[in-house]
Structure formats: C-alpha cells, structure tokens
C-alpha cells in the first residue's frame, strides 16, 4: 500500500485519485492517518488536483488540533491504494552529514535507479487503470430552511431569488412552504451540489444577500450521495 512518492507529481496524482470519492484517508472524520499523509506532502497540491487540494486545505485547518485527532499514526505504507508502493522519503539519504556518506555507494546508486524504474512502472500501470474508470464526482444532497422577516414577506419572490442563484455544480430541486407560527412560513428547498465546487457557506452568503426577503438560512439536512 502507499501513494508512491508524495513529494512528486506522480505521487500527488495517486493521492488525488484516491480522494476522488473520499473525504479522509481513513473513515469519515479527520484522524492520525490524515496527519501522517499530510506531513509527507511538501506543500499544497496544484489546483488541477482538486480532490487532493480540497483534502490538504481541510486537514491544514486542524493544524493546532492534529495531536488530539483520533487514531494512531502509522507508516505511510499502511495507507492508500493496495497496488501502489510507498516511496516517499526514499531520497532522504541526500540530507545526511558528510561523515555518513558512503564513498563506495555505486551499487546502492544502481539499486536506487532500479527501484526508481520499478516505481515508475507501477505508477504508470496504476494511472492506466484509473484512466479507464470514469471519475467519481463527490456530491451532497442539502435541505435548506430559508426564513423570511415576517408574514408579509412575498414568499413567491423569495423563492425566485433563491433559485436565481446559479453556479457550476449546483442544481435546485423541489421546495415547499412550512408553517413556523404566527402566520409565518419558511421556504424549505432541496439542492444537490458538487462538494468541490459549492459549499454551504457560499449558499448562505448568496441567499442572505437578498436581505429584503431573507432573515436567515439554516441547513436542515445534509447527506452525501
């Protein structure tokens, strides 16, 4: 198991593919598995590796709490796809002190080249397999509660304003008015979003911008698809 060399573009690509249908390295909450892989990555993945970049930024937000995240940090080779070998840090000997340098290391260099060739072959095979599979897009179904100011608010106009919000990765669904008391009704509206493109913060910001109609917005239900 592993991701190849996480300091290389090929290794980051493996990580990106692995996270295409996952929020975390293991399970459904941040854990020491995420910390171990995060620390092996030298910096933010490029923008075209959207799944890896999403995960990196999310785990980075736990920087102060990482020691308290659940689980036990294990070797990198215990995480990731089963058919990829971990090679991150295989070049760490470059940082040794001069006293530790093997002046007769030609055999090791030959072995290193052989290991590199095998690794590149395995990664090429893995990429070939992944290329044949359709990319999975992580989506969520969200139910929003949109509350008006009072019973005189034009709810038809309020819904028109909400549905006027358009974004790549956002699809509006069914809606209904739900009584909340004192003659006031709230708008309950369903939407499906692509997780990497649309978030609840963005929805709240744009919906509450219609301040003539909208008092507040809450997430009533959130489910991964």
UniProtKB/Swiss-Prot annotation:
Disulfide bonds: none
One Gene Ontology term of the molecular function aspect: guanyl-nucleotide exchange factor activity
InterPro entries given in the database record: eEF-1beta-like_sf, EF-1_beta_acid_region_euk, EF1B_bsu/dsu, EF1B_bsu/dsu_GNE, Glutathione-S-Trfase_C_sf, Transl_elong_EF1B/ribsomal_bS6, Transl_elong_EF1B_B/D_CS
Domain spans labelled GST C-terminal: 2-84
PROSITE patterns recorded: EF1BD_1, EF1BD_2
Region annotation Disordered: where it falls in the sequence: 80-114
Assigned GO CC terms: cytosol; eukaryotic translation elongation factor 1 complex
Residues with Phosphothreonine modification: 88, 93
Family, similarity comment: Belongs to the EF-1-beta/EF-1-delta family.
Role summary: Catalytic subunit of the guanine nucleotide exchange factor (GEF) (eEF1B subcomplex) of the eukaryotic elongation factor 1 complex (eEF1). Stimulates the exchange of GDP for GTP on elongation factor 1A (eEF1A), probably by displacing GDP from the nucleotide binding pocket in eEF1A.
Protein name, UniProt field: Elongation factor 1-beta
UniProt source species: Oryctolagus cuniculus (Rabbit)
């Amino acid at each position: 198991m592993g991701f190849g060399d996480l300091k290389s573009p090929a290794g980051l690509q493996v990580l990106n593919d692995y996270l295409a249908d996952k929020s975390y390295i293991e399970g459904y909450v941040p854990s020491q598995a995420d910390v171990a892989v995060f620390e092996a990555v030298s910096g933010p993945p490029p923008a075209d590796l959207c799944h890896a970049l999403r995960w990196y930024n999310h785990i980075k937000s736990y920087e102060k709490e990482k020691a308290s995240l659940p689980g036990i940090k294990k070797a990198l080779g215990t995480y990731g796809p089963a058919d990829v070998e971990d090679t991150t840090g295989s070049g760490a000997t470059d940082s040794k002190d001069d006293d530790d340098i093997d002046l007769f290391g030609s055999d090791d260099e030959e072995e290193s080249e052989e290991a590199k060739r095998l690794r590149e072959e395995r990664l090429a095979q893995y990429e070939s397999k992944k290329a044949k599979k359709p990319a999975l897009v992580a989506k969520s179904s969200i139910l929003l509660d949109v509350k008006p100011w009072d019973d005189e608010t034009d709810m038809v106009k309020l819904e028109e304003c909400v549905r006027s919000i358009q974004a790549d990765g956002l699809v509006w669904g069914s809606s209904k008015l739900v009584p909340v008391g004192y003659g006031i009704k709230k708008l309950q509206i369903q939407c499906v979003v692509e997780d990497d493109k649309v978030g609840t913060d963005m929805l709240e910001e744009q919906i509450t911008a219609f301040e003539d109609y909208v008092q507040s917005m809450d997430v009533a239900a959130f489910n991964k698809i």
